[in-house]
Amino acid sequence: MFKFALTLTLCLAGSLSLAQHNPHWWGNRNTIVHLFEWKWSDIAQECESFLGPRGFAGVQVSPVNENILSAGRPWWERYQPISYKLTTRSGNEEEFGDMVRRCNDVGVRIYVDVLLNHMSGDFDGVAVGTAGTEAEPSKKSFPGVPYTAQDFHPTCEITDWNDRFQVQQCELVGLKDLDQSSDWVRSKLIEFLDHLIELGVAGFRVDAAKHMASEDLEYIYSSLSNLNIDHGFPHNSRPFIFQEVIDHGHETVSRDEYKDLGAVTEFRFSEEIGNAFRGNNALKWLQSWGTDWGFLPSGQALTFVDNHDNQRDAGAVLNYKSPRQYKMATAFHLAYPYGISRVMSSFAFDDHDTPPPQDAQERIISPEFDADGACVNGWICEHRWRQIYAMVGFKNAVRDTEITGWWDNGDNQISFCRGNKGFLAINNNLYDLSQDLNTCLPAGTYCDVISGSLIDGSCTGKSVTVNENGYGYIHIGSDDFDGVLALHVDAKV
């Protein structure tokens, strides 16, 4: 009997873990966008007016729980919890719930960035949160939850990143480190996440997951409620989990400890795609992109060109400040069938701590748009760049097809097909790409969705005529505005 019960328990745990890799997308949609620091009311409007019509699958939103008020209102104050009340600079609980409902109604899922590892760092005296809650972080006193000192690990600093104990039980940059093995802490975290599930979210991005023991996270995840069927989720659906685990390949705490609990952020993807499109690695090598590069299996990898953290760091990672290379890298990211794709939507920054666009009272301001739909008032909105939202449509059109017809020039010009539904070509050389290439598409004329749009049967950008053998003449000049060309069956003239 014991053996049967143990087997049943293991099977249930395995099935729950597998279910936590499912992002619950509508139809053929398969791209998440991180609307970093947006207000809930603006996200709701964006779902209805842009993301839904453009085929985006979901939105990662900034942390929803009450956070400390920091001088100047830097973005990172959102990562310093005071309580689990749903009041932040982005809005209150009513506005959050309205946003989730409206986005779900148009097929755009919501994934919340959640902070399970810690509470706020030290603050002189009494700290006040965005909902008016008082706390004394230096005493580990957070009455808004409530947490007291006994709910935290003993104070210590991470000085050796190769020491598992320090990484998982000491304070990350001074943030008060919760003890996730505590029954009380577990109950409060589960209560917080279950409340968000009741409001209709589809899942969670778990911040600083590597700083928590995987067995503690497994307990918390497995204790969560199923997703709310009133928001269109099938019965017994589990929340999608993707976990921030920075693993460059030599870490004491490995991504492999978390990959079976849910997806894991694949930081090596971000670094290597940046290296390639910055010219430090020839694009021809991308033919084997994926696990051959040491990446996680596709269904366990949350992939991105940049995120809100590493876009602010020096190094290989690309961001909006290198737009031509960034758009090429994003096109490759969304065209190549590897990983669970997320694109970044940023605000402009001059230094690491730059706050989101705000008014004189330090309230976040809504994005404004020009005649082309691009943002103009401090918001970058990469997701509204035609070259990026068009590739979201490309990715939808070619879903469930494989790479075929790979071509390269032995250097930095490449092309490939996605079955007989899509074709991508990239030129990252300092000379033109001018070549008859196999597009694998049915005969006809296709609109290049990078340089233009198909409107009322006419293409506003380049077009390519494909012959009966699937070949078309592809030209990408070295001085063209964009170094990429994309065709697919839903953009046939």
From Swiss-Prot:
Its cofactor is Ca(2+); chloride. It is found in: Secreted. InterPro entries: A-amylase/branching_C, A-amylase_C, Alpha_amylase, Glyco_hydro_13_cat_dom, Glyco_hydro_b, Glycoside_hydrolase_SF. GO terms for cellular component: extracellular space. The gene is Amyrel. The keyword Metal-binding applies. Residues 1-19 form the signal peptide. This is Alpha-amylase-related protein. Binds 1 Ca(2+) ion per subunit. The modification Pyrrolidone carboxylic acid is found at residue 20. Midgut and fat body. One of its GO terms (molecular function) is metal ion binding. Ca(2+) binds at residues 117, 168, 177, 211. Monomer. It catalyses: Endohydrolysis of (1->4)-alpha-D-glucosidic linkages in polysaccharides containing three or more (1->4)-alpha-linked D-glucose units.
